[in-house]
């Protein structure tokens, strides 16, 4: 009774009600479709309905992994029925991402390495997985400079940390270590019945699928940056920001969304987008 839960799928622009009411969602959708969100007052109104920080993180995650069976499909969102409740999205069914279904991708996007996923999520098209209505709210938010800068900097934060090649490769390593000992037995048990052109049914096919994930982890960060340069007409130049914390017990440094509490950290940011850096004292300390 305390939650609105909706789903949208490619066959219709109208949300499917799973729980609660669609009234609040339709209100903000219509507001954003009929008002210029580049105007700061309109943006602030929209931000009262949408959890902007959560929206940005969600969009970045879907775009980075290249889940192209989205946003027209596999899209759910919810809002608490409270005075401070705001719409947030639920990430699920992202198995099209990380170069998972290369054969199927050929019919939709051509190639993971060359397809512009940010543009896919921004402007909308005529395909089942990104009709214009499914990208309209995100597109409207990006008309606002404050939101656009926050999106760009947050994306850079993630590319510098959780979406970096080193970290995603580490995650692949850790998952492979768990799964690999059982792959041969799994294939021997189920054999050819596994094969549907996307599911490896030999050890060589399994190793090839894992290698594609490593390849994706290698090329995707640079491609993601290039997509931002293209869509937002950036000059493409980046600066390396290096941060040093002498005493982590006394405080840490916050850059955009990241809290840095190590002696040496560095990340790449676009030179034409301002970033936020501040020193944050721990309890009992001050700067």
Residues covered by each model-derived region:
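Extracellular, modular beta-sheet/disulfide-rich ectodomains of secreted and cell-surface proteins
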Residues: 234-271, 286
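Middle-to-C-terminal accessory/interaction subdomains
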Residues: 1, 14-17, 21-244
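Acidic, His- and aromatic-enriched active-site or binding-groove loops in soluble protein domains
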Residues: 1-8
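Surface-exposed interfaces of beta-sheet-rich extracellular modules
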Residues: 187, 276-287
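Disulfide-stabilized cysteine-rich extracellular repeat microdomains
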Residues: 222, 258, 274, 282-284
């Amino acid at each position: 009774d305390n939650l609105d839960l909706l789903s949208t799928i490619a066959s219709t622009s109208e949300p499917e009600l799973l729980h609660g009411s669609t009234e609040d969602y339709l209100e903000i959708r219509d507001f954003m479709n009929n008002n210029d969100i580049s105007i700061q007052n309109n943006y602030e109104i929209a931000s009262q309905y949408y959890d902007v920080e959560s929206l940005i993180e969600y969009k970045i995650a879907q775009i980075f992994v290249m889940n192209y069976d989205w946003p027209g499909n596999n899209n759910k969102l919810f809002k608490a029925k409270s005075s401070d409740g705001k719409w947030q999205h639920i990430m699920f069914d992202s198995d099209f991402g990380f170069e998972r279904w290369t054969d199927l991708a050929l019919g939709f996007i051509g190639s993971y390495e060359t397809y512009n996923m940010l543009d896919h999520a921004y402007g909308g098209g005529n395909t089942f997985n990104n009709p214009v209505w499914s990208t309209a709210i995100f597109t409207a938010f990006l008309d606002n400079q404050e939101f656009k800068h926050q999106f760009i900097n947050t994306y850079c934060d993630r590319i510098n940390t959780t979406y970096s090649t080193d970290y995603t490769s580490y995650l692949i390593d850790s998952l492979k270590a768990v799964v690999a000992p059982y792959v041969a037995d799994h294939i021997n048990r189920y054999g050819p019945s596994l094969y549907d052109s996307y599911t490896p049914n030999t050890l060589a096919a399994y190793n090839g699928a894992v290698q594609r994930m490593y390849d994706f982890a290698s090329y995707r960060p640079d491609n993601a940056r290039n997509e931002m340069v293209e869509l937002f007409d950036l000059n493409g130049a980046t600066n390396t920001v290096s941060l040093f914390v002498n005493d982590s017990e006394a405080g840490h440094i916050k850059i955009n969304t990241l809290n840095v509490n190590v002696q040496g950290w560095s990340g790449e940011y676009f030179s034409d987008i301002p970033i936020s850096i501040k020193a944050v004292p721990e309890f009992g300390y001050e700067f």
